[in-house]
Curated annotation (Swiss-Prot):
Protein name: Small ribosomal subunit protein uS4
NCBIfam families the UniProt entry points to: PRK05327.1, rpsD_bact
Main function: One of the primary rRNA binding proteins, it binds directly to 16S rRNA where it nucleates assembly of the body of the 30S subunit. With S5 and S12 plays an important role in translational accuracy.
Positions of the UniProt region annotated as Disordered: 18-46
Family of this protein: Belongs to the universal ribosomal protein uS4 family.
Length: 205
C-alpha cells in the first residue's frame, strides 16, 4: 500500500467505517480502530462527541478538507435559503474536485484534488487548477485532451465499485461531465450515512 493510500485509509480506520466503499479499505477486515488498543470497546459518545464525529467523517470524505475551509463552506451554507445541512452538502458537491471524482475521471477524492492541481482539468473550455473551484449548474467539466489517455484515468473510468450520480451527465468517450443540478443529501451516493444536521448542531453550540 502506498503512503498516500495509508494516509487515506487512516481516515477509515479512525472512523471505523469504509467511508468511500472501497474494496481495499482495512476496516473491511476488522471492526475496530488502529493501534494496540484498537480492540477495546469504546464508551458511548456524548452529544458533542457524536456531532464532532459527524463533522470529522464528512470532512474526511471530501479528501480531508481543512477546518478553516470546511467552516467557511458551512458559514456560506447558513447564509443560503433553506436547510443549512442540505446546503452544506450541495456546496461540497459543487467543488470541482468532487465533480471530477463523481464523474469517474479519477479513482479517489484525493486523486481528484491532485489531478486538478496539476492542470489536467478544464471548465467551460478553460483550464482550472483550483480544486475548491465552485461549479455552477450547466458548467461543462472535461479532462484536458493530452491527459485523456493517462493510465489511471482510463482505469478510473472502468471502476465498477461506484456509479455516476444522476445530477451529473457524463460522456465517458469524450471525458466530459455536465453539472445538471445541485443535489440533495438523498441524491448523493455516500457509502455510509452522513449527518449534516449534526454538523449544524456542532457549529451552533
Amino acid at each position: 500500500m502506498t503512503k498516500r493510500s495509508e494516509a487515506k485509509y487512516k481516515i477509515d480506520r479512525r472512523m471505523g467505517q469504509n467511508i468511500w466503499g472501497r474494496p481495499k479499505s482495512p476496516v473491511n477486515r476488522r471492526e475496530y480502530g488502529p493501534g494496540q488498543h484498537g480492540q477495546r470497546r469504546k464508551g458511548k459518545l456524548s452529544d458533542f462527541g457524536v456531532q464532532l464525529r459527524a463533522k470529522q467523517k464528512l470532512k474526511g470524505y471530501y479528501a480531508n478538507i481543512s477546518e478553516r475551509q470546511f467552516h467557511s463552506i458551512y458559514v456560506e451554507a447558513t447564509r443560503l435559503k433553506g436547510d443549512s445541512g442540505e446546503n452544506l452538502i450541495g456546496l461540497l458537491e459543487r467543488r470541482l474536485d468532487t465533480v471530477v471524482y463523481r464523474a469517474k475521471f479519477v479513482s479517489t477524492m484525493f486523486a481528484a484534488r491532485q489531478f486538478i492541481n496539476h492542470g489536467h482539468v478544464k471548465v467551460n473550455g478553460k483550464r482550472v487548477n483550483i480544486a475548491s473551484y465552485k461549479v455552477k449548474v450547466g458548467d461543462l467539466v472535461e479532462v484536458k485532451e493530452s491527459s485523456k489517455q493517462l493510465t489511471f484515468v482510463l482505469e478510473a473510468n472502468q471502476l465498477a465499485e461506484r456509479d455516476v450520480p444522476d445530477f451529473i451527465e457524463v460522456d465517458h468517450g469524450k471525458m466530459t461531465a455536465k453539472f445538471i443540478r445541485i443535489p440533495h443529501l438523498s441524491d448523493v451516493p455516500f457509502a455510509v450515512q452522513m449527518e449534516p444536521h449534526l454538523i449544524v448542531e456542532f457549529y451552533s453550540r
